[in-house]
Amino acid sequence: MALLSPPSPPPPLPPLRRRPASPTLLAVATRPSSLLSLPHCHCGLPLPSTANARAYSRSSRRRRRVAASLGQDEPGVSDTAVAPEGEGDSEPPASSDGAAGDIASSAEQPEASPEDLEDIRQVKRVLELLQKNRDMTFGEVKLTIMIEDPRDIERKRLLGIEDPDEITRDDLADALVEVNEGRIPENRVALQLLAKEMTEWPDLEMEAPKKKSKPGKSVYAKATDTGIDPETAAKRLNIDWDSAADLDDEEEEDDETEVPSAVGYSALYLLTAFPVIIGISVVLILFYNSLQ
């Protein structure tokens, strides 16, 4: 009896090979079809060819432009038609950033009230007076406005006052800059506080005392003999010799003070004689006690 051999296993199948899709086929698959934009009323008609679809999309766009220029909507034409990629002269969509910029630029600021205009005039008037009477520049005025009173800081710290909506010194400085640039500040509360503070500027109308422009001696030259000839100094400084020679006389006249004749050198002699008088008195008292 012959032994039966087991059946041999089937030969292994070769692995499947996947061919990548052609770029042309992918482009065709992803390209939107113009037939999707046809209205529902044309669904029963036979599908047109590619050339007819392109011609139909172009005519649809032309009809939409004519209807838009006349302010009418043409019935039966869909507004969501997708034109084939790379064809037609369709206009690019408007950018959202550009539209937002146009809206922001067209937004008008609230009109200024008469009180705001009066506050602006007050601030400009104070700036002119400070520049004329105090010789202060705009930067110096701005720095002065930004300085906060330390007493207010300590009071707020002790009372625990923390208001995030409170007008700060930086807000006042920003309002001052906008007024100086000829613009109306957006923060009207800061404008009112700025006008109130600047109108209360101390001694605003008073002019600053003008210093003498005539040159004088330094403190060291007054206390020490520098050995500088006034005539030589006058030639080097390009000033008149007479005015240079009169410097010492004028300064001496300013330093001298009028003293009454009764309080002259006699007071000095009297103070010096006090110890002598006391010594003589002590000697006389001791001598008188020794005689007893």
Curated annotation (Swiss-Prot):
Main location: plastid
Location relative to the cell: Plastid, Chloroplast thylakoid membrane
Coiled-coil regions listed: none
Function of the protein: Involved in light-induced chloroplast development and growth. Involved in the plant response to abiotic and photooxidative stresses. May be involved in the suppression of photooxidative damage.
Transmembrane portions of the chain: 267-287
Top-rank lineage group of the source organism: Eukaryota
Feature: transit peptide: 1-67
Annotated protein name in UniProt: Protein CHLOROPLAST ENHANCING STRESS TOLERANCE, chloroplastic
Compositional bias annotation for Low complexity: 49-58, 94-107
GO process annotations (BP): photosystem I assembly; response to photooxidative stress
Record keywords: Chloroplast, Membrane, Plastid, Thylakoid, Transit peptide, Transmembrane, Transmembrane helix
Gene: CEST
